[in-house]
């Protein structure tokens, strides 16, 4: 296995600087706000107005007074922003940037699954389609899943989907059973303890921090488990000088930016598993971000009836996580 190296912030070339200036000008002209997830490339994060995890970005989308929302993320995120702001223009740099986790839970199959447990409350991860959100009672994110489930009476059955690893983590934290949909994020599923242990041996003083979408075998060895936002906050306040980070490596940019004196090592992936980079997030580029502001396309459109159903479960999440 190739020796791992701590993350360094990449330099910005002249073309990226020119694009950044043009994006900033177009943003002012359009009265737009640019929201970007931590997993996007550093250049995107540098020009964004808000960089955050799913919950932070949903809140930013809900409260903005901008006329145009540009969402650099994957499709369900732009869709959520449109559901929260039906009267605003919502753009995505590339609306073909989907989420395999969300796609692993088709609405018709999930509906049939739900019908097997008619008395169950449905809590769905925000990494899901508008159709699934409309089928759900409450939405959650990785940062508030434990808190939201903890507010449900212990005698109430819960269906949790689509991420089985996040669901399993919530079950372990609260010592309660839930009925899990068997979906997963291919990035986080790619981490195994056998491989990460090699990084731990290479960096014995580093803390292992992991996202709850990782498998249990990884979480059981982690010094801290949390959403991307929580991992970022922990890396800032922890006295540790080095961290092995088991989540999509886009977060390393913000970690290094906030704590330049610390070392951040992307956790190695299982060599027999899928890649540990979210290729869909990387479809957001400076070129297509600039182009979407220039052409005001592609725009996100959500059916009004579907949006109304999905809005109820999203609003419930926001109410329960204040």
From Swiss-Prot:
**Cell location:** Cytoplasm
Reactions mediated catalytically: iminosuccinate + dihydroxyacetone phosphate = quinolinate + phosphate + 2 H2O + H(+)
- Write down the EC number: 2.5.1.72
**Positions contributing to iminosuccinate binding:** 37, 54, 125-127, 142, 211-213, 228
Answer yes or no on keyword Aminoacyl-tRNA synthetase: no
User: Which SUPFAM superfamilies does this entry report, sorted A to Z?
Assistant: NadA-like
- Listed GO cellular component terms? cytosol
Please name the GO terms that the record assigns under molecular function.
4 iron, 4 sulfur cluster binding; metal ion binding; quinolinate synthetase A activity
HAMAP family recorded: NadA_type2 (MF_00568)
- Quote the protein name from its UniProt record: Quinolinate synthase
Q: Which organism is it from?
A: Prosthecochloris aestuarii (strain DSM 271 / SK 413)
The UniProt gene name for this protein comes to nadA
């Amino acid at each position: 296995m190739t020796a791992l190296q701590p993350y360094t912030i990449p330099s910005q070339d002249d073309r990226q600087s020119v694009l950044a200036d043009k994006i900033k000008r177009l943003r002012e002209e359009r009265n737009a706000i640019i929201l970007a997830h931590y997993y996007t490339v550093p250049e995107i994060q540098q020009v964004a107005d808000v960089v955050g995890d799913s919950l932070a970005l949903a809140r930013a989308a809900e409260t903005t007074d901008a006329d145009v929302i540009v969402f650099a993320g994957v499709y369900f995120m732009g869709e959520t922003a449109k559901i929260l702001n039906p009267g605003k223009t919502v753009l995505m740099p590339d609306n073909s940037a989907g989420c395999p986790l969300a796609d692993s839970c088709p609405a018709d199959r999930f509906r049939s699954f739900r019908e097997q447990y008619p008395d169950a409350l449905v809590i769905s991860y925000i990494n899901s389609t508008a159709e699934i959100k409309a089928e759900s009672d409450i939405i959650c994110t990785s940062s508030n899943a434990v808190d939201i489930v903890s507010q449900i009476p212990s005698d109430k059955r819960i269906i949790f989907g689509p991420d089985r690893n996040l669901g399993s983590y919530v079950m372990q934290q609260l010592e309660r059973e839930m009925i899990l949909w068997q979906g997963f994020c291919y990035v986080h599923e790619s981490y195994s303890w056998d491989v990460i242990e090699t990084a731990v041996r290479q960096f014995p003083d580093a803390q292992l921090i992991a996202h709850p979408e990782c498998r249990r075998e990884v979480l059981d060895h982690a010094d801290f488990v949390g959403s991307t936002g929580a991992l970022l906050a922990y890396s800032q306040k922890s006295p540790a000088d080095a961290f092995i980070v088991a989540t999509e490596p886009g977060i390393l940019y913000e970690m290094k930016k906030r704590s330049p004196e610390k070392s951040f090592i992307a956790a190695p992936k299982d060599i027999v598993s899928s890649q540990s980079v979210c290729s869909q997030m990387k479809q957001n580029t400076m070129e297509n971000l600039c182009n979407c502001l220039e052409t005001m396309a592609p725009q996100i459109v959500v059916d009004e009836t579907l949006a109304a159903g999905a809005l109820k479960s999203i609003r419930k999440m926001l109410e329960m996580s204040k």
